[in-house]
C-alpha cells in the first residue's frame, strides 16, 4: 500500500498552488464582493489543462486521472472555493456527462471545446420543486418532427449565466417516473434557452449560480444525450464522480482555513505571548489538523478507486463528500473562533472560508442524501 503521490502528481500540486497564489489570491475578495468571476482567467486555467483534466488528449483533455483532478481542485479551493467550484462543475458534471454518454459526434462537437477551454459548461438537474427529489423533475421535452421542444426551468446551476453548453434533464415520458427522464445538450443562443435569475448567495459568490429557463426551446434530435429515458440513471453515475470533486473542494478549503488559523495563532499576542502557546488553542489546531488528514485519506481513496476501470465507487465517493464537507464546516468554524473578533472581519480570510464551506454539505447531494446513499450500499438496497 502506497500513500505517497508520484513526482508528477507532486509537480502538478506545486504548479496549481503557484498559479492559485499568484493569479487568484490577490483578487479573491474583489471577485467575492462583486459576485462575479472574470472570464479572462479561463484561458490560463485551460493552458494548465485544468478544464479537461480527466479527459483523453484526443478530446482536448490532459489525459490525467481523478487523483490529479482532486489535487487540482484541492489546491484551487485552498485559495478560493469559487474557482474550484467553477472548474469542478465544468469537468465533473457537464463535460463528464458528454464524455460518458455522448456519441462520437457529440464528443467531437462539444467535449473538445470544453476540455480544451474554448467553452465553459453547465449542468442542470435541480429544479425549484425537485431538489433532493431529483426524480421529481417537471421540465418536459416533447418530441416533434424536428426533434424536441423543452419547457420548464432549472435552478442552482453553476456557470449557468455564462456557459456555452449546458447538459439538462427533462421528462420525456411522464408514465415511467425516473425512467422517463432524458438528458439533452443545450447551446448558448438556442431560441427559447436563456439564463434566469442570478442568485445572491451566502458564499462561493464569485461562482455565478443561476436559473436556466426553457421556453419552447427547440432542440435537434442529435442533441439527445444518451438513450431516451436514461438521463436520470446517467446523472446518478455522473454524481459519483462529481462528489469526489466536491469532497476535494471541501478538503482544499479546510486546509486553507487550518493554515490561516495556524498562521494567525502564531502571530497574535495576548497576555504577553502568542495565542498558539495556550493549550486551548493548541487543542483546537490539533483536532482541526487530524480531521483534515482523515478527510484527505477518504478523498484520495475515492479518487484512486475512480481511476480503476470497472470498479464501483458510489459508497466511497459519498463517504468522502459527507465527511470532508462536514469537516470543512467544523474547521472553518474553529478558524473563525481562533481569530476572535478578527474572524468576523473581511480583512482576514476566516470569514470567507466560513461562508464558502457550507455549500459543500448541500451541493451535489446534501449530507442527509449522502447518508442515505451510504446506508443503502451497506444494506444492499437499490
Where are these regions (language model features)?
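Well-ordered alpha-helical segments within folded domains of soluble proteins
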Residues: 90-95
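Short, charged, solvent-exposed linker or helix-capping segments at domain edges/interfaces
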Residues: 180, 195-197, 221-228
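Short, surface-exposed charged micro-motifs
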Residues: 138-140
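A short core secondary-structure module
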Residues: 87, 151-195
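Flexible, small-/acidic-enriched active-site or ligand-binding loops
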Residues: 136, 189-220
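Alpha-helical interface subdomain recognition
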Residues: 1-89, 101-106, 113-118, 133-134, ...
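A short, Trp-centered hydrophobic/proline-enriched beta-strand micro-motif
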Residues: 117-125, 169
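Short Gly/Pro-enriched turn/cap motifs at secondary-structure boundaries
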Residues: 87, 114, 129-132, 156-159, ...
Amino acid at each position: 500500500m502506497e500513500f505517497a503521490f508520484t513526482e508528477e502528481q507532486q509537480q502538478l500540486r506545486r504548479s496549481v498552488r503557484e498559479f492559485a497564489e499568484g493569479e487568484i489570491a490577490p483578487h479573491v475578495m474583489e471577485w467575492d464582493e462583486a459576485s462575479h468571476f472574470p472570464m479572462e482567467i479561463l484561458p490560463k486555467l485551460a493552458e494548465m489543462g485544468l478544464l479537461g483534466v480527466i479527459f483523453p488528449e484526443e478530446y482536448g483533455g490532459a489525459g490525467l486521472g481523478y487523483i490529479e483532478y482532486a489535487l487540482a481542485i484541492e489546491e484551487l479551493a485552498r485559495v478560493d472555493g469559487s474557482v474550484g467550484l467553477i472548474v469542478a462543475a465544468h469537468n465533473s458534471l457537464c463535460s463528464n456527462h458528454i464524455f460518458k454518454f455522448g456519441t462520437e459526434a457529440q464528443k467531437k462537437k462539444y467535449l473538445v471545446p470544453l476540455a480544451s477551454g474554448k467553452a465553459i459548461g453547465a449542468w442542470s438537474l435541480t429544479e425549484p420543486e425537485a431538489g433532493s427529489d431529483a426524480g421529481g423533475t417537471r421540465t418536459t421535452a416533447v418530441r416533434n418532427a424536428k426533434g424536441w421542444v423543452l419547457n420548464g426551468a432549472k435552478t442552482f446551476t453553476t456557470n449557468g449565466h455564462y456557459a456555452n453548453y449546458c447538459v439538462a434533464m427533462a421528462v420525456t415520458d411522464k408514465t415511467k417516473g425516473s425512467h422517463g427522464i432524458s438528458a439533452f445538450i443545450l447551446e448558448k443562443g438556442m431560441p427559447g434557452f436563456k439564463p434566469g435569475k442570478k442568485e445572491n448567495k451566502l458564499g462561493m459568490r464569485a461562482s455565478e449560480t443561476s436559473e436556466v429557463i426553457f421556453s419552447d426551446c427547440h432542440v435537434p434530435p442529435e442533441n439527445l444525450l444518451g438513450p431516451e429515458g436514461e438521463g436520470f440513471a446517467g446523472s446518478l453515475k455522473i454524481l459519483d464522480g462529481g462528489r469526489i470533486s466536491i469532497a476535494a473542494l471541501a478538503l482544499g478549503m479546510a486546509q486553507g482555513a487550518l493554515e490561516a488559523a495556524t498562521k494567525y495563532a502564531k502571530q497574535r499576542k495576548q497576555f504577553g505571548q502568542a495565542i498558539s502557546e495556550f493549550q486551548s488553542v493548541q487543542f483546537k489546531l490539533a483536532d482541526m489538523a487530524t480531521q483534515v488528514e482523515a478527510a484527505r485519506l477518504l478523498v484520495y481513496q475515492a479518487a484512486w478507486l475512480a481511476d480503476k476501470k470497472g470498479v464501483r465507487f458510489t459508497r466511497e465517493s459519498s463517504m468522502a463528500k459527507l465527511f470532508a464537507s462536514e469537516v470543512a464546516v467544523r474547521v472553518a468554524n474553529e478558524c473563525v473562533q481562533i481569530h476572535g473578533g478578527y474572524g468576523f472581519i473581511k480583512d482576514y480570510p476566516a470569514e470567507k472560508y466560513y461562508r464558502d464551506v457550507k455549500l459543500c454539505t448541500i451541493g451535489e447531494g446534501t449530507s442527509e442524501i449522502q447518508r442515505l446513499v451510504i446506508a443503502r450500499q451497506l444494506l444492499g438496497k437499490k
